[in-house]
């Protein structure tokens, strides 16, 4: 949670946080929405920002000023309002520690923004978390399936050391 230390030079961060997952073109689409894009069938834990981790870092000192689950950082009015010392900050929110994950079945949502805090002033920040990974969809034609009835596998390689092999039964 908040690390304190704002003291007499305190200002506040008032954060509005959202996750954009409608309109994401993905293969596990549950429905078609306006403009022909699709809406994914993401798990609630991945799209509900209350489950996200929020980190506020002082960009001048690189010290964390606050860290916690969004639901734990909200006040009685359901808003994230943090007292911070005057200075420059970065706020980051994400649904899980997916930054260095090379292959995952789970979507990774992340948002980042910088802002400044002035003494005695409330700084409003709108932070939007977006899909920060790539989803791969593999579709096989009927002619491929006919030609390779017995067995086959498909290898997906990200050229960064992560390889995933899908056999006939997992496609």
Residue ranges: model-predicted function:
Residues 1-21:
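Bacterial Sec-dependent N-terminal signal peptides
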Residues 122-157:
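Compositionally biased low-complexity segments at domain edges in trafficked proteins
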Residues 40-92, 150-171:
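Tryptophan-paired
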Residues 28-46, 60-66, 98-106:
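Acidic Ser/Thr/Pro-rich low-complexity disordered segments
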Residues 9-13, 50, 78, 87, ...:
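Residues at beta-strand starts and edge strands
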Residues 3, 21, 70-76, 96-132:
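Structured interaction patches on ligand/partner-binding surfaces of diverse proteins
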């Amino acid at each position: 949670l908040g690390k304190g230390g704002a003291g007499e030079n305190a200002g506040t961060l008032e954060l509005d946080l959202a996750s954009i997952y409608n309109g994401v073109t993905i293969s596990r689409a549950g429905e078609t929405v306006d403009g022909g894009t699709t809406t994914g069938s993401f798990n609630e834990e991945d799209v509900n920002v209350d489950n996200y981790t929020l980190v506020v870092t002082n960009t001048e000192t690189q010290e964390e000023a606050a860290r916690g689950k969004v639901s734990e950082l909200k006040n009685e009015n359901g808003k994230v309002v943090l007292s911070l010392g005057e200075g420059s900050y970065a706020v980051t929110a994400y649904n899980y520690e997916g930054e260095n994950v090379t292959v995952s079945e789970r979507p990774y949502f992340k948002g980042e923004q910088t802002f400044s805090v002035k003494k005695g002033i409330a700084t409003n920040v709108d932070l939007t978390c977006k899909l920060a990974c790539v989803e791969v969809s593999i579709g096989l034609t009927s002619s491929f399936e006919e030609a390779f009835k017995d067995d086959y596998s498909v290898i997906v390689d990200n050229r960064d050391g992560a390889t995933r092999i899908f056999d006939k039964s997992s496609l």
